[in-house]
């Protein structure tokens, strides 16, 4: 009998396949994890931007959650695009009952710059979901939104990481420094430790779905029972290779390659 760890993503769609639950499921598969998905929003988007968003009904969202949790318990859960307070209020009770790692990707803006979350929902996210998370995975703009100040350098990143842990209560936070000048430096902050990864910047426009993919790999590794450090370390290596080997698709910010990384 073959055993596969199980990971669940709760997020929006991307018909072009580069981001959202499509990227998450590809990442789970690439890391030998059985993937499940609950759709929060139907998003018409591609490498050029977001064209239209329609949220699933509250009834459909609840039904999907019940379908999953009543039948196949996950070993790790990831949330991505949670666009409204209502969506978060429906999901939150399920997150509170989790007995497995919860990875919160605070998706607020698409790679194209399009806004993906209501203003009121940002407050709910910070006060009601962040305290439930095993790890949150903001990029610099998302971290700035959470902490309320600008981040210009690694020192600001460290200040932001410590503030997020203290004020909002997640168990850990990894802040991605891809938006800073210079090398790509990412920081992982836990209650006890601080770790940093640094790699040369890859000059490319093909970064669609990088945040989703990074968080999904962390989720997959945690579903396998890996430590936070091991999960983030693997995600960093995975996304670096995925960007390096991007398939040059689309007319805008193209997707990464979810198949290129091999252990």
Briefly describe each language-model feature range:
Residues 17-33:
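N-terminal basic/disordered segments at the start of proteins
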Residues 119-194:
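Conserved phosphate/ATP/ADP-binding segment of small-molecule kinases
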Residues 1-4, 9, 20, 182-197:
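Acidic-glycine-rich active-site phosphate/pyrophosphate-binding loop
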Residues 22, 145, 204-228:
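Short, small-residue alpha-helix embedded
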Residues 32-36, 195, 221-234:
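Phosphate-handling active-site elements
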Residues 10-16, 195-208:
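Short pre-catalytic strand/loop immediately N-terminal to key active-site residues, enriched for Gly-Thr
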Residues 2-9, 29-111:
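Conserved N-terminal subdomain of the carbohydrate kinase-like
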Residues 4, 55, 71, 229-263:
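Charged C-terminal helix
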């Amino acid at each position: 009998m073959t055993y596969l760890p199980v990971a669940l993503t709760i997020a929006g769609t991307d018909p072009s396949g580069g981001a959202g639950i499509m990227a998450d499921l590809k990442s789970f598969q690439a890391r030998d994890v059985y993937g499940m998905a609950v759709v929060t929003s139907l998003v018409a988007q591609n490498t050029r931007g977001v064209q239209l968003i329609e949220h699933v009904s509250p009834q459909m969202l609840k039904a999907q959650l019940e379908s999953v949790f009543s039948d196949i318990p996950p070993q790790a859960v990831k949330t991505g695009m949670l666009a409204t307070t209502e969506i978060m209020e429906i999901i939150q009770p399920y997150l509170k009952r989790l007995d497995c790692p919860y990875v919160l990707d605070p998706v607020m803006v698409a790679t194209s710059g399009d806004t993906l979350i209501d203003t009121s929902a940002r407050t709910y996210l910070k006060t009601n979901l962040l305290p439930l998370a095993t790890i949150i995975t903001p990029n610099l703009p998302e971290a700035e939104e959470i902490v309320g100040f600008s981040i210009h350098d690694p020192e600001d990143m460290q200040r932001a990481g410590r503030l997020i842990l203290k004020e909002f209560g997640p168990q850990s936070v990894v802040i991605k420094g891809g938006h800073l000048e210079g090398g790509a430096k990412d920081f992982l902050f836990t209650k006890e430790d601080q770790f940093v990864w640094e790699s040369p910047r890859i000059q490319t426009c093909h970064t669609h779905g990088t945040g989703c993919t990074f968080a999904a790999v962390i989720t997959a590794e945690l579903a396998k029972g890996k430590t936070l450090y091991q999960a983030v370390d693997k995600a960093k290596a995975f996304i670096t290779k995925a960007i390096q080997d991007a398939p040059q698709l689309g007319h805008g910010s193209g997707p990464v390659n979810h198949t290129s990384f091999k252990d």
